[in-house]
């Protein structure tokens, strides 16, 4: 179904995989390795999920993160999105053509100034981190006034990006427990509690994140859809 596509090329994976691993150091070296990961349970055969994931990516992630080893046309064909619908709702750059690579327009210098480093390309992020990590990470932001963007993340402590899905989830509050660390008591964030300000209920938000992760897994290896 194309009902999930609303509102505002060919990938040479083997050639670029080493380069992209080098471009993702912040993700590959993220802390929080001992945090239990929730199962994403995404389904690459679910076209409606993939379409919604593409919509979420373009609306909430693409302003900063590209998937520059994909082409709009390949995505439209693979996800069964009509080309006119793709152009109207998912290609925001008026100069971009359907056959172009999915590169965003944010200048690298500006991105480095705003975030401390250029936001990484996400074509292969699901390969680098895994779908369970992504699914848990996107559901683990919490309010932290001490951080530059007002949020932190259980899976990725001291994360250097805002909670881009805040509109959907709201800003969860941290849940603390006191634990002994090296013989001293420390307050540790062990979970989050949603504040009810997001557009989606918890189950709806989890489903949206699953769709986004589904799209990112597809992005990392489009040939999986042929299996």
Cite the ranges covered by each PLM segment.
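Post-cleavage N-terminal segment of exported redox proteins
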Residues: 4, 10-44, 216-223
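Extracytoplasmic/secreted proteins, especially bacterial periplasmic and envelope-associated proteins
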Residues: 48, 52, 56, 129, ...
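Electron-transfer interface patches adjacent to heme c in soluble/periplasmic c-type cytochromes
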Residues: 80-154, 159-182, 186-205
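The canonical Cys-X-X-Cys-His
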Residues: 57-68, 212
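Electrostatic cytochrome c docking/interface patches
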Residues: 31-55, 66-77, 220-226
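Bilobed periplasmic-binding protein/Venus flytrap-like ligand-binding cleft at the lobe interface
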Residues: 57, 137-144, 212-216
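Juxtamembrane amphipathic/hinge helix adjacent to a transmembrane helix
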Residues: 202-226
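Processing junctions and N-termini across compartments
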Residues: 24, 55-58
């Amino acid at each position: 179904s194309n009902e999930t596509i609303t509102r505002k090329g060919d990938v040479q994976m083997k050639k670029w995989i080493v380069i992209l691993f080098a471009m993702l150091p912040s993700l590959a070296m993220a802390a929080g390795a001992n945090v239990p990961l929730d199962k994403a349970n995404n389904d690459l055969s679910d076209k409606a999920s993939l379409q919604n994931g593409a919509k979420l990516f373009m609306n909430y992630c693409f302003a900063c993160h590209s998937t520059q080893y994909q082409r709009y046309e390949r995505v439209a064909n693979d996800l069964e999105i009509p080309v006119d619908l793709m152009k109207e709702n998912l290609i925001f750059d008026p100069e971009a053509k359907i056959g172009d690579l999915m590169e965003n327009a944010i200048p690298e210098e500006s991105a480095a100034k705003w975030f401390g480093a250029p936001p990484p390309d996400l074509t292969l992020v699901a390969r680098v981190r895994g779908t369970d990590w992504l699914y848990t990470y996107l559901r683990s932001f919490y309010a932290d006034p001490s951080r530059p963007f007002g949020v932190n993340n259980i899976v990725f402590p001291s994360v250097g990006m805002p909670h881009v899905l805040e509109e959907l989830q709201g800003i969860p509050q941290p849940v603390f427990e006191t634990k002994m660390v090296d013989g001293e008591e420390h307050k540790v964030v062990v979970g989050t509690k949603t504040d009810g300000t997001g557009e989606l209920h918890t189950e709806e938000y989890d489903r949206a994140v699953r769709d986004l992760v589904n799209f990112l897994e597809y992005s990392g290896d489009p040939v999986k859809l042929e299996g």
